[in-house]
Swiss-Prot record:
It comes from Porphyromonas gingivalis (strain ATCC BAA-308 / W83). This is tRNA1(Val) (adenine(37)-N6)-methyltransferase. It is found in: Cytoplasm. One of its GO terms (biological process) is methylation. Disulfide bonds: none annotated. SUPFAM superfamilies: S-adenosyl-L-methionine-dependent methyltransferases. Keywords: Cytoplasm, Methyltransferase, S-adenosyl-L-methionine, Transferase, tRNA processing. Pfam families: MTS. Its main location: cytoplasm. Coiled coil: none annotated.
Amino acid sequence: MPTDIFSFKQFDIDQTGCAMRVGTDGVLLGAWAGEDAAGSIPQHCLDIGTGTGLIALMLAQRFPQARVQGIEIDPIAAECARANAAASPFSDRIVIASGDILDSSLESLIGNQRFDLIVSNPPFFKSSMHAPDRQRTMARHEETLPLEKLICRASELLSPQGRLALITPRDRLKDLRLYAATYRLVSSRLTEVRTLPHKEPKRLLSEWRPADTAIDRSPFTDTLIIHPATGYYSPEYVRLTEPFYTTSFRILAVG
């Protein structure tokens, strides 16, 4: 039976009662989002659908000057995230709000703040695949946070130089580009995630920025392979996640 406490190097995640537990998707997004070759460091971050608070805590660890806000529609998960943030070394820089990011009343919590970095690991299952309990359905099914509405809302909350970072199924890229163009965002980074070299990519890490035009410039897409061989991890995966995981990795260079 899985433990309710997942320990990282600088913080713990208590998952008691939470529908969605710590997983590879969240860890990848928290480690990947906001990397910028130009050296731009976000000062104000927003985690939409923060769940246990995992990604919010990862951002607080990576960006010591940043203030991080998490928003979670499930009140049980929001309380869990608050407790995890309060127990962390970053408690003075993290605020967790309970509510629906699509609800205009949340302006009272966000105020006029615009964010340099918005992240989300959104639900992506379709309504025909409902989980038996409501809490898990909210966490896993897109009807609670449709991708287009998420991108629309994020575009309203981004600062002029802000970035929106997402992890989604790879097959949603066409939809992502359509919705981003509608709300005048362009892609700046795309990373396909493969578990093994011979497997098709199942996940996509994508980053989007406000644009003067709604034309997607289709940036170079790179690939992250988690396991170059069974039982081993790639150097790139280790580089991303080593600051967080407490375990040692068996590394095998790709190529």
